[in-house]
């Protein structure tokens, strides 16, 4: 029976019994190797590794994640809702809704979601997924 493939960079490092700093992962889109900071960021953002049928593993670098987010927002935008309205649309609490940053694709934590609701900002539905603004991208916007 095949061993399950790791979904995160940390799981990959643990599976291979090597330190995270020694992981060399190419970006699926630009083929550049991710830096150590990008590897750590990939874990923090909750992004998964990309596996091919031939068992090659790839990731997505920060530049390509940003470009992908912009492309999807421009081409697959569906709707926007104001703060708490997302709970009405989804029929569940905002804490239970998966929302990613519209710029860096980080999975938003509860504080970031509540901050958007408190400030009465908008959530955007893009390609059947909700987007908001993470604290890091908010600080540099």
Curated annotation (Swiss-Prot):
<dbReference type="GO" id="GO:0030430">
    <property type="term" value="C:host cell cytoplasm"/>
</dbReference>
<keyword id="KW-0244">Early protein</keyword>
<keyword id="KW-1119">Modulation of host cell apoptosis by virus</keyword>
<dbReference type="GO" id="GO:0003677">
    <property type="term" value="F:DNA binding"/>
</dbReference>
<dbReference type="GO" id="GO:0052150">
    <property type="term" value="P:symbiont-mediated perturbation of host apoptosis"/>
</dbReference>
<dbReference type="GO" id="GO:0052170">
    <property type="term" value="P:symbiont-mediated suppression of host innate immune response"/>
</dbReference>
<dbReference type="GO" id="GO:0006355">
    <property type="term" value="P:regulation of DNA-templated transcription"/>
</dbReference>
<dbReference type="GO" id="GO:0008270">
    <property type="term" value="F:zinc ion binding"/>
</dbReference>
<comment type="similarity">
    <text>Belongs to the papillomaviridae E6 protein family.</text>
</comment>
<keyword id="KW-0863">Zinc-finger</keyword>
<dbReference type="InterPro" id="IPR038575">
    <property type="entry name" value="E6_sf"/>
</dbReference>
<dbReference type="GO" id="GO:0006351">
    <property type="term" value="P:DNA-templated transcription"/>
</dbReference>
<protein>
    <recommendedName>
        <fullName>Protein E6</fullName>
    </recommendedName>
</protein>
<feature type="zinc finger region">
    <location>
        <begin position="27"/>
        <end position="64"/>
    </location>
</feature>
<keyword id="KW-0238">DNA-binding</keyword>
<keyword id="KW-1035">Host cytoplasm</keyword>
<keyword id="KW-1090">Inhibition of host innate immune response by virus</keyword>
<dbReference type="InterPro" id="IPR001334">
    <property type="entry name" value="E6"/>
</dbReference>
<dbReference type="GO" id="GO:0042025">
    <property type="term" value="C:host cell nucleus"/>
</dbReference>
<keyword id="KW-0804">Transcription</keyword>
<keyword id="KW-0862">Zinc</keyword>
<comment type="subunit">
    <text>Forms homodimers. Interacts with ubiquitin-protein ligase UBE3A/E6-AP; this interaction stimulates UBE3A ubiquitin activity. Interacts with host BAK1.</text>
</comment>
<dbReference type="GO" id="GO:0039502">
    <property type="term" value="P:symbiont-mediated suppression of host type I interferon-mediated signaling pathway"/>
</dbReference>
<keyword id="KW-0010">Activator</keyword>
<dbReference type="Pfam" id="PF00518">
    <property type="entry name" value="E6"/>
</dbReference>
<keyword id="KW-0805">Transcription regulation</keyword>
<keyword id="KW-0945">Host-virus interaction</keyword>
<dbReference type="GO" id="GO:0039648">
    <property type="term" value="P:symbiont-mediated perturbation of host ubiquitin-like protein modification"/>
</dbReference>
<comment type="function">
    <text>Plays a major role in the induction and maintenance of cellular transformation. E6 associates with host UBE3A/E6-AP ubiquitin-protein ligase and modulates its activity. Protects host keratinocytes from apoptosis by mediating the degradation of host BAK1. May also inhibit host immune response.</text>
</comment>
<feature type="zinc finger region">
    <location>
        <begin position="101"/>
        <end position="137"/>
    </location>
</feature>
<keyword id="KW-1048">Host nucleus</keyword>
<keyword id="KW-0479">Metal-binding</keyword>
<keyword id="KW-0899">Viral immunoevasion</keyword>
């Amino acid at each position: 029976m095949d061993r399950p493939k790791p979904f995160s960079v940390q799981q990959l490092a643990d599976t291979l019994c090597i330190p995270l700093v020694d992981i060399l992962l190419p970006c699926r889109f630009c083929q550049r190797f991710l830096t150590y900071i990008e590897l750590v960021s990939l874990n923090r953002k909750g992004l998964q590794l990309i596996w091919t049928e031939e068992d090659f593993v790839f990731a997505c670098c920060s530049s390509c994640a940003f470009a992908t987010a912009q492309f999807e927002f421009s081409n697959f935008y569906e709707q926007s809702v104001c703060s708490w309205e997302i709970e009405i649309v989804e029929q569940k609490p905002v804490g239970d809704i998966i929302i990613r940053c519209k710029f860096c694709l980080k999975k938003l934590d509860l504080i970031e979601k509540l901050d958007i609701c408190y400030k009465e900002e908008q959530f955007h539905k893009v390609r059947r997924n909700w987007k908001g603004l993470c604290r890091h991208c908010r600080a540099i916007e």
